[in-house]
């Protein structure tokens, strides 16, 4: 491996740095976009119990917010549960936009790497060609310099492709996964709105009944 780096010359180092950065992003996104983390399996059931309990503590909401990206959306909805349905929906949409932005973090950098890497490879190719032609003189040409120029050109061209292709594949994969996760969170959020709607209707009916029937000052929540 070291022999290849030496043969590729100094233009290969920007490509190596780019590849290391790309691998770091790919590993980080694989970890952060786990479905079990973004959308925990039993979270909706826990939220149903929390909403149905009628007594929601601040600590429970903060724990839900820290649980997962979906938990952030659910926590915002619960904080606004006594508001109108329109306000609940608006708060969910706003929280969803923030969560979506977090899920898309670094994907732009990954896309940039897939675009820049071939250009860096092309730059190395040009450097190699310059060195190649410098081997020619009026008295002939230096075979060693000629061979080194070809080596620099080819290794950098290949290096640019090797870095760009995985970065592009990873970008497309993560882009698709984010779309899937966002769609799933939207469905769960809509379900939560229906739950909130049921609770609001129940509370409204209970309040009407309290107005017409003496319940000893007790509120049904």
What are these model-derived regions, one by one?
Residues 2-8, 93-114, 144-155:
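Alpha-helical membrane-interface segments at transmembrane helix boundaries
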Residues 144, 148-171, 175:
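Pore-lining and gate-forming transmembrane alpha-helices of multi-pass membrane transport proteins
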Residues 202-221:
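Single conserved hydrophobic/aromatic residue that forms the stacking wall/gate
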């Amino acid at each position: 491996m070291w022999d290849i780096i030496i043969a590729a010359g100094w233009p290969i180092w920007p490509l190596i740095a780019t590849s290391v950065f790309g691998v770091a992003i790919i590993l980080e996104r694989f970890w952060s976009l786990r479905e079990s983390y973004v959308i925990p399996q039993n979270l909706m059931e826990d939220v149903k119990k929390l909403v149905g309990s009628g007594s929601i503590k601040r600590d429970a909401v903060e724990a839900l917010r820290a649980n997962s990206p979906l938990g952030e959306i659910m926590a915002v909805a619960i904080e606004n549960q006594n508001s109108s349905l329109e306000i609940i929906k608006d708060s969910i949409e706003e929280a969803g936009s923030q969560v979506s932005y977090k899920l898309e973090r670094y994907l732009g950098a990954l896309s940039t790497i897939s675009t820049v890497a071939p250009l860096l490879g092309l730059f190395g190719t040009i450097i190699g060609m310059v060195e190649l032609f410098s081997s020619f003189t009026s008295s002939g040409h230096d075979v060693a310099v000629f061979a080194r120029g070809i080596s620099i050109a080819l290794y950098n061209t290949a290096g640019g492709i090797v870095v760009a292709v995985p970065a592009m594949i990873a970008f497309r994969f993560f882009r698709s996964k984010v779309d899937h996760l966002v769609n799933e969170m939207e469905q769960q959020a809509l379900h939560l709105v229906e739950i909130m709607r049921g609770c609001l209707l129940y509370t409204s009916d209970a309040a009407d009944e309290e107005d017409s029937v003496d319940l000893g000052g007790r509120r049904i929540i």
